[in-house]
Amino acid sequence: MCFTSCSNKGGKLEEIEKQVNKIALNTANAEPIYKLYPTRNMWNFLKLDTRNGKISIVQFSVEDNEKQFEYELSNKALCENNAPGRFILQPTENIYNFIMLDQMSGQTYQVQWSFDEEKRFVTPIQK
């Protein structure tokens, strides 16, 4: 954006332009609120709310809309009112397990996804 073609009393327009550009740059570099992580099952992803650690399982299909769904894996927020990018997921060698890292506290969690609701969980890894 350029405001300098307008009247510029006291250099205020340049200052406003600098502030707008700074906000635009910060917004462009901002961490996303949600991230999709592929699983080794080609039809399934984990959707992570990077602010609070909530996770859902997302399945897509190229043939049938009834095979598309999103299920909650963990609907419990691990923290409140945090900035995007706090939590990340790292895949493991096990197809159903990920490690979740709280990048602020260093706490790690074992995340297990499954089609069977009883086998889904997020649990802290003890230090």
What do the PLM-derived regions correspond to, one by one?
Residues 7-9:
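Bacterial signal peptide processing site
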Residues 2-5:
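C-terminal motif of bacterial Sec signal peptides marking the signal peptidase cleavage site
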Residues 75-113:
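Short, solvent-exposed interaction modules
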Residues 27, 35-40, 88-93:
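Structural signature of eukaryotic scaffold interfaces centered on beta-propeller domains
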Residues 107, 111-127:
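C-terminal partner/receptor-binding element of secreted or periplasmic proteins
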Residues 14-32:
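Post-signal peptide N-terminal segment of mature Sec-exported envelope proteins
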Residues 57-85, 123:
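A low-complexity, Ser/Thr/Gly/Pro-enriched, surface-exposed linker/loop concept
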Residues 43-50, 97-103:
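Short beta-strand motif characteristic of blades in beta-propeller domains
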